[in-house]
Design a protein with these regions (language model features):
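Metal-dependent amide/peptide-bond hydrolase catalytic core
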Residues: 1-4, 8, 189-369
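Acidic/His- and Gly-rich active-site-bordering loop/insert found
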Residues: 2-107, 130-135
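Residue-level signal for inorganic ion chemistry
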Residues: 27, 31, 172, 212, ...
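A generic beta-sheet turn/junction motif
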Residues: 68-70, 79, 183, 194, ...
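Acidic-glycine-rich active-site phosphate/pyrophosphate-binding loop
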Residues: 88-102, 180-191, 331
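Short pre-catalytic strand/loop immediately N-terminal to key active-site residues, enriched for Gly-Thr
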Residues: 102-113, 338-344
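Fold-level recognition of mixed alpha/beta catalytic cores in primary-metabolism enzymes, strongest
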Residues: 116-221, 230
Length: 369
């Protein structure tokens, strides 16, 4: 591999500056909500082809993949290109897909989370190859779906495409710092079963909503008891949704499901966090079995019809600050002239829960926003 010449890199970037900006605006203009990433994936593939990638394709799940080189060492640049929805369009002050530039900042749906990292990855890899920086490497751009189930895309990529990287760079926003980990997550549900009756004769029913109230109250008070870690921080727990089964608005509900998001730090096991919630269920309900808790399971088909079933457990992970990949990220960042800063962490979840948390592949984050 050639020595890094930051001046040469900057010269190439300057030559492509307008194309990079246009590319970003165009991929943000293509809606990719609800994991529908086919059209934006095609646009990304067109740019990779233009920039001389050796191979571009859609994997079985429908994620976009581009490869440069075929060396023995494997590097993956990970950027999810799906987004959440836009909510009520009337509440936007500008078209979220057209976007706007204000004070040198580009605003659009997905500009930060996380389409903003894709142009830098695509052009960065192409420029690195031109400068001889990827000799001995197979380098991949991986534009994937992540919003609805973190880590499922890379998990399927490794198992079904047979590509297991040696190192991963995740493009989630890091404020242009190097990030080296984050808390994990467990999604669970508490299900209560009751008996319906007409509200005028509610004494004949068994209200399922009332059965989950002790759990909701308990969750609201549980956080001080959760685990803590000097780098990753304190565990978190939140009731995020509730679904009620009832014949009508004038009937006693016969079913109620409460959904819980539990952020886990090091030292907290999936079995332990589920048991914490189970202990919030009144003993009488636990004994009768009419209120239960279980981890969620994801088996929704992707837009291609591909199904990859996984439990919704996402482990915490962190690389040591002294790890060679973290140090390489810090060194690369220093070459750009950015102010010195210690490596940080995300306060949300990323595909790192699979790359590093489940597969044990050294991973770092670096991205705009």
């Amino acid at each position: 591999m050639s020595p890094i010449d930051i001046t040469a890199i900057q010269s190439h970037v300057a030559q492509h500056r307008d194309d990079i900006i246009t590319f970003l605006r165009e991929i943000c203009a293509i809606p990719s909500m609800d994991s529908q990433i086919g059209p934006v994936g095609e646009r990304v593939q067109a740019e990779m082809t233009k920039m001389g990638f050796d191979e571009v394709w859609f994997d079985s799940m429908g994620n976009t993949v581009g490869r440069i080189g075929n060396g023995p060492r494997v590097l993956v640049y990970d950027s999810h290109i799906d987004t959440v929805g836009i909510g009520d369009p009337d509440e936007w002050r500008w078209d979220p897909f057209q976007g706007k530039i204000e004070d040198g900042v580009f605003y659009a749906r997905g500009a930060c989370d996380e389409k903003g990292s894709t142009p830098g990855m695509v052009y960065g890899l192409a420029i690195a190859r031109r400068l001889g920086l990827l000799d001995g490497w197979a380098a991949y751009y991986f534009g994937n779906m992540e919003e609805w189930c973190d880590g499922i895309a890379p998990h399927a990529f490794v198992e079904h495409e047979g590509i297991r990287p040696d190192f991963v760079v995740i493009g989630e926003p890091t404020k242009m710092l190097v990030y080296r980990g984050h808390k994990g997550r467990v999604e669970m549900k508490v299900v209560a079963k009751g008996k319906s009756a007409h509200a005028a004769s509610n004494h004949l029913g068994d209200n399922a909503i009332y059965k989950v109230l002790p759990v909701i109250e308990g969750v609201s008070r549980l956080e001080p008891e959760l685990g803590d870690h000097s780098f990753l921080g304190h565990g978190k727990i939140t009731v995020t949704d509730m679904a009620v089964e009832t014949p009508s608005l004038n009937a006693v509900p016969n079913g109620c499901t409460v959904y819980i998001d539990r952020r886990v730090t090091f030292g907290e096991s999936v079995e332990g966090v589920i048991e914490q919630v189970r202990q919030l269920i009144p003993a009488a309900n636990r004994e009768r079995g009419d209120v239960t808790v279980e981890m969620l399971f994801y088996d929704e088909p992707s837009y291609t019809g591909f199904v990859f079933p996984v439990d919704k457990y996402f482990p915490a992970w962190a690389l040591e600050e002294s790890h060679p990949l973290v140090q390489a990220g810090q060194a690369a960042r220093a070459l750009t002239g950015l102010p010195d800063a210690a490596p940080g962490k995300w306060n949300f979840s990323t595909n790192g829960i699979y790359w590093a948390g489940k597969a044990g592949i050294p991973s770092i984050g670096f991205g705009p926003g």
